């Protein structure tokens, strides 16, 4: 199972290169949610500005996310943006729910709220940015595992992978790895 947590694009011509890079992964069952850099082009930023804790506005230079979405769907991947899915991968029954990027308030948890199917072997929560206000709702609904991206293992790190900032609401010790 391939789980894509977003921020795939950086340029208006990037879809073919993105699909080429994903290559053989597209033949596997997959799920995706989008990050801001699927919708709008990234902009240069001094990463030390993250230390100020201010959220910056996206560029609002549109990226071709619809074409990427269509290609993902054509390859059989499931769009988990504001959606729930139930399916099997091999013999494993999955219950999946996802939201659009909460870092820029594109999520609407009410559209997917509620516990996962109890018959599922594994329940997955997907979101681009691991914002606590959304993670807490997934946990309260009983999802077993949440997968997200956005933090890049810490936007600025000291040696030993010690993050100085996360660029989201989670604490610095949780920017990478597996956590209970």
Label for each model-derived stretch:
Residues 22-27, 116-119, 138-142:
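Short, conserved loop/helix-junction motifs that constitute active-site signature segments
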Residues 101-106, 110-118:
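Active-site-proximal loop/helix segment associated with metal-binding centers of metalloenzymes
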Residues 1, 93-102, 124-128:
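Active-site-proximal beta-strand elements of phosphoester/diester hydrolases
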Residues 76, 93, 142-146:
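Glycine-enriched alpha-helix->loop->beta-strand junction motifs that scaffold or abut catalytic
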Residues 1-88:
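Core catalytic region of metal-dependent phosphoesterases/phosphodiesterases
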Residues 77-78, 84-96, 118-122, 180:
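Beta-strand-turn-beta hairpins that frame and shape the catalytic cleft
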């Amino acid at each position: 199972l391939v789980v894509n947590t977003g921020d795939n694009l950086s340029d208006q011509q990037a879809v073919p290169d993105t699909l080429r890079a994903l290559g053989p992964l597209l033949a596997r069952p997959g799920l995706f949610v989008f990050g801001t850099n699927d919708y709008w082009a990234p902009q240069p930023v001094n990463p030390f500005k993250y230390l100020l804790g201010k959220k910056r506005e996206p560029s609002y230079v549109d990226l071709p996310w619809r074409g990427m979405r269509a290609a993902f769907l054509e390859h059989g991947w499931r769009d988990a943006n504001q959606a729930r899915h139930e399916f099997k991968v091999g013999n494993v029954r999955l219950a999946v729910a996802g939201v659009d990027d909460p870092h820029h308030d594109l999520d609407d948890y009410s559209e997917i709220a509620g516990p996962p199917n109890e018959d599922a072997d594994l329940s997955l929560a997907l979101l681009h940015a691991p914002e606590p206000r959304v993670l807490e709702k997934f946990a309260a609904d009983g999802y077993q595992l949440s997968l997200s991206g956005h933090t890049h293992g810490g936007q600025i790190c000291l040696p030993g992978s010690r993050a100085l900032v996360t660029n989201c609401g989670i604490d610095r010790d949780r920017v990478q790895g597996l956590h209970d």
